[in-house]
Structure formats: structure tokens, C-alpha cells
Amino acid sequence: MTTLSVFLDVPLAQKLEGSLLKTYKQDSCPKKIFLAFRVCQTSKGQPWVSSVVPKMRLQIAQDPSLNYEYLPVNGMRSFTEASLKLLFGKHNQVIVENRVGGVHTVGDNGAFQLGAQFLKIWRKDSQTVFIMSSKKEPYGLVFQDMGFTVREYSFWDSKQLCMDANVLLKQAPHDSIFVIGNICDCNLTQSQWATLMASLKNKRIFLFFDISSQGLSTGDLEKDTGFLQYFVSQGFEFFCSQSLSKTFGIYDEGVGILVVVALNNELLLCVLSQLMKLTQALWLNPPITGARIITSILCNPALQEEWKQSLKGLVENIMLIKEKVKEKLRLLGTPGSWDHITDQNGSHSYLGLNIQQVEYLVRKKHIYLPKNSRINFTCINAHNIDYITQSINEAVLSTKGLD
Amino acid sequence: MTTLSVFLDVPLAQKLEGSLLKTYKQDSCPKKIFLAFRVCQTSKGQPWVSSVVPKMRLQIAQDPSLNYEYLPVNGMRSFTEASLKLLFGKHNQVIVENRVGGVHTVGDNGAFQLGAQFLKIWRKDSQTVFIMSSKKEPYGLVFQDMGFTVREYSFWDSKQLCMDANVLLKQAPHDSIFVIGNICDCNLTQSQWATLMASLKNKRIFLFFDISSQGLSTGDLEKDTGFLQYFVSQGFEFFCSQSLSKTFGIYDEGVGILVVVALNNELLLCVLSQLMKLTQALWLNPPITGARIITSILCNPALQEEWKQSLKGLVENIMLIKEKVKEKLRLLGTPGSWDHITDQNGSHSYLGLNIQQVEYLVRKKHIYLPKNSRINFTCINAHNIDYITQSINEAVLSTKGLD
């Protein structure tokens, strides 16, 4: 066939994600361990699922009253409402004043895709986006593809081994966009908060929060997102990607909400109407299963309580693992203080190792973790904790004095 | 509060879709009928669902062996494979030669969103898109938002009351993109096909097929998409949006595939790799439920057979409704030939009324249908067929001589 291909100029795209996981999978060593799974693992190394979810899946499948019609473009309204109440608390100022709203989004990136499209059109002056380094790969790509300049930042101070929100003040130019994850881990004082807020306002920085694991930090749903209320009370307008897949264990049904907080209801309706237009072009009608499971649980007090308890159990287990790791390192006499392990909240925290130590673990011990040593602590269990802590000890000893 | 809103310049977006449905809903007349639902209706006016689907939903919810982990970026591989086999037939040339592939997409617009993004980047010369008028609203918006010039066309010849594929030849400028639905309804002769193909090649027109109801035209899955094989055999490269929600009755789980046919495997892999990159930014991991239900049915011969039979039953019912409408109009002595009703395949077909007649039905009879008189015949049932046919008769008589 002599026809020239239409696709002649299309090169093979570079793979962006999963190189660490790929190397892990190709490793034939039986001792190999992967410490960077995105989702929480059970003690048996399976993805964690809230006990209430399988029950709800069954109940939904057996319900003859459900209809399987298309959802409207803005998605499942009861899902959006229940999720916003979860995020802000039922009686929050923005809910009472009717100036918070949300659009049902698809997948882990959906809310960022939608929000970025909006910002590209309606905030032409904001073309630089700062993204926390741990999320640069999935979210950065979204903004990059649309022509934004993407820079990364980290709250983690690898010298002081603690979180530091001052990076926000130092790095951000005027009119930039900031994608912010769990800022409550930074433990700011009242006056530090005030300085931060003033600086953000002064620089006209647009905040795009990323709440993908509400409740997984402290085990307390309200406490985890309390800082959002503070921003609301200070008159900030912002976007927030609220993802609920991780906290229910419905990873296969990536579902979320692009939350919009505006100064008043009129502005909110304008923003939502533009978002709806974009959603229509993106996927028209979002799939329902994830939203249906979550809504059924959130709207039933008994099931909601069961879910909260399962989440609490997960967080207690994370704390226990961290305590054990710290204790084992202490018993091994590993140089350094390991308090930073238990000082950090949530499933994903920094081990506080340097690059040489990480390399040592990967190459000599077949323990796979990212270069910044931010690991998923739920990947550590009774079967592998001794091997992991002994290996960390070896890594630290072998690289002593190399800094 | 004196702060100026970030969203100050954002106007309220115009609503694009559903104005007919909205007017219908606001109509308080008890006789009102809506003839333009997107999905097939049962004789009781409920959305049609294949009998095999509820069973499969239950089976999936009860299966303890399933894992709920994230799907990879390219989606569920077994779903893509099973769907491609359905589209092309197991032993088709493109499958054997390994030059067809697909990406699991989300919602009814997902495949067009993904395909349009690709074409925007990799076919910079193709900036005009022709879309069949019945699908202009959902798909046109996708291309329009990305800066393409969108024009509409229709195979329906409202004078001759038949389908005419020659519009493709007349209207299309060089290097344009054509979104094509069910071309097999045009009943082209071998020589007309040959002329059409030569002209498309000569004008370097890129084809983007829309297969959203395979099997619903003739009741025969292979026959409905046979024309795709003809394009393949003639050395065409193309995209195809394959949507399976309508043919299974899983409207709430909008799921599909962006199908790519390339001249060889190497080209295919390049295109798929670029699509994967775009998918990552769009939704990262697609939701699984719709794909899981469909794959479980397609990969089980007994269930597949049950699904095919349910589809056949649906198509037979559509034909029966059309026959009845034609017969009732004949008995009423309605002027004109109504053969075009039964000459057209599928649930959605043209009634062949002019604008005055449509207006008459909407305003005087509370029967809601689009201006081009393309209706969903499954909205007609034993309860409303007499009222509908009598009203059509009145409409035709009352506007006689107005043309």
C-alpha cells in the first residue's frame, strides 16, 4: 500500500508515570518491597476498603427502584450536597450563605482538568501554577498540557525534618495559582496563619486545594479540613478538588467534586454555569456508581458512623505502624532522631532519608521508595517491618559522613 | 467585605441543551408527550435495560474475588479487546494485523474529547469539522471549545424523504474532519461507495465515526458496522467513538472507547501513546463499573447470546412500532407516502414532517419533537399511538398547501 499515513508525524510519547513501580515489578528478588502505593494497604497487603462499601455495593445492585438513566451534566445533586457538607460541616458559613457549590467530576484528575480549563479562560493573568512536588506528576501534567508554567514546591524541610508553610510566601510571584494539599500538617501558629493569609491576598494568589484524603490525617473528618473554614472566614475565593475514592476505598470508581467558593451566590452561579458548559464537552454525563455508593453511605447516619469508625481504625493503624518503625529504629540504635515520623499525619509521610540512603535501599535492599523518601506507611506490616527497619538502619550507617 | 471578587468578569453561561425537554417538563397539559428521549423506552415508558444487565450487576457486587484498585491509564484491557472484537468481528483484517487499538473513555463525549485534543495537536491543517446535525449539540461543543470551526450536515434529504450520502462529497473542503454516524442507512450501491471513497481520499478527509448503537439499526451486530470493514479494506485510517451504554442500557455509567485504526502497528502504538498522555490529564483512571458489566457479558458466550437476543427483541419492537404508525396513518387517510418511516433503521428516525407540521404538534397537541422531526420511535406505545397518529394527521391536513 503506497498511501501515506495520516499519523506519520506522530512520535511515541514518553511514559511519564510509574517508572518506580515498573522497576519494582521487573525485580525478581523475592524480598522486594514497594513502599509507594497510592492507596492504603491492609495488613495483608491488599488495597484497604471501608467495611461498609461491599455491603452498599450489594444493596445498590439489589435495589429494583433505582433508575439507570443518564445523570444530568452537573452530576448527582445529592452526592454534591452530601460531599460539601462533609467538607465544610453542615452549618458552615459558605453553605448557609449559599456561596459554595460543586460539580461532580470523574477520576482523580477530573476536578483539576475542569478547574484548569476554567482558569485558562477566565484568569488569563494567572499562568504560573505551583504544585506540591508529591502530586506534580498527575496534576502538573493537566496544567502543563494547557500551556500553564508549572513549578513544584514542597512543604517538607529536609534539613529541619518538618513541614514549613513559609515556602508559599517565599516562592510565589503575584497572580500565581497554588495547588495546596494538606496544609494543616504545617502546624502554623495564629500569627503565622495571619501573615500567610495577608501575603496570599497581597499577591492575589489563587488557591486550588486538593483534599483527597479527608479524615486520613488525624482520623477526625472535621479537624482535617478545618483550615478551609479559616480561608472562607478570611474572605478567600477558591477552588478545591475533593476526591472521595481513597477514604471509602472505591479506587476503581474515581469520583470527586470541583468545589467552588465565591464571595456571593450570584458570582457562584456564574462560575458554575461556565463549569457546566466545560463539563458537557468533557464527558457530558458522569458515571454514577462511585457517587451512588458514597451518597448512600453519607445520607444514612448508621452507615456514616460505620464508615467513620472504619476510617478511624485505619488512621490508628497508621499511627501504630509509625510508632513501631520509630521504636525499632531506636532499638537498632540507628543514628538520628526519628520523631519526625510520628510528627507527620496521614498514610503518606517522609521517612527523612537523603538520596544516598534511598538509593541504598532501592539497589541493595530491593525496597522501592521515591527519592524524597515520602512513603506510604500502610505498605509496612508485621511481615516486612523487621527487614525494612534493619535495611534503613544499614542505609543510614553505610552513608554516614557522606552528606 | 470590600474585597473584589476573583470571578468578577465571569458571565452566566447560556444553557445549550435540553430546551425542548425543559419546555415539555413545564407543560402542565396531561396529554403531553415527549418524542425525543436519547435512550430507548420500554412499552411502559421506562428506559430500556437489557435483561442480562441487572443479573450482572448483582453478580459483580457479590464477587469477593474482584479487586477495587485503580485501573491503569489506558483503562480495562479486556474491555477494550472485547469491544474491538464486537466492532470489527474477531477475525477482521485490522485485528489480525494488529493495527487497531483503543483507549477506554468516560461518558458519552469522552472519546470525542480525547480524539479532538489529539487532532488539535497532530493535525493542525484540519480545523474544520463537519458533524451530523442530530449530534451537533453534544459533539459540536467539544470541537468548538477547542477552536475548530464546526459545521453541520445531514444525510436526510427532506424533499426526497430518504438518506443521501452525497452531502459528504458536495460540502466537504480538503483536509476537513467528518464525524459520521450510521452511514449504512444510506443504502449506497457498490459504485456509489467507490465514488465516495475516492472523493474522501482525494480530499484527505479524516473520518471520525460515531458508533453509539451497534445492533440497534438492523438487529444484527455485524451488519450494522460492516461499513467500517469496507473503509479498513480501502486503506483508510480513522478514529471511531464506540459507545456501549445505549445497547446494554447502562446509561448511568457512560463508557466507551476511542478506537484508532492505523496503517500499521508502529503508527498505532505512537498514536495510542499520545492518547494515553492526554487521558492521564483528562481523568487519570477511568471508572470501572460500566466496563466491568459489559466485559463480563461479552466474554461469556451464554450471557452474550442473551444480550444479543434482548437487543434483537428491542429492534423488532422498534420495527413493529414503525409499521403500526405507518398503518394508522394509512387508515386515517393522511396525505403522502409514509414508507420512509419503515425504510429507515434504528430507534431514532425522521417522521418526515416540515417545520409548520412540527410546530403544530408542539403548540396545539403538546407533542414534543425536534424541528427536523427526527424522533425516538420507542417513545410511542400502545397508550399514546392513537393520539400521536391522529395528531400527525391533523398537522398534515392543517398545513396542506402551505409549503
Features from the language model and the residues they span:
Chain A
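Conserved PLP-binding catalytic core of the aspartate aminotransferase-like
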Residues: E306-K364
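Hydrophobic beta-strand scaffold residues
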Residues: L35, V150, L207, F238, ...
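Eukaryotic N-terminal low-complexity, Ser/Thr- and Lys/Arg-rich leader segments
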Residues: M1-A13, Q309, L397-D403
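Structural signature of PLP-dependent enzymes
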Residues: L272-A291, I297-K326
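Glycine-centered flexible beta-alpha turn that most often forms the glycine-rich phosphate-binding loop
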Residues: D210
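N-terminal "arm"/small-domain region of PLP-dependent enzymes with the aminotransferase-like
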Residues: T2-K85, G89, A281, P287, ...
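Active-site PLP attachment segment
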Residues: D224-C270, Q274
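Conserved core of the PLP fold type I
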Residues: V49, P54-R204, G215-L216, L221-Q229, ...
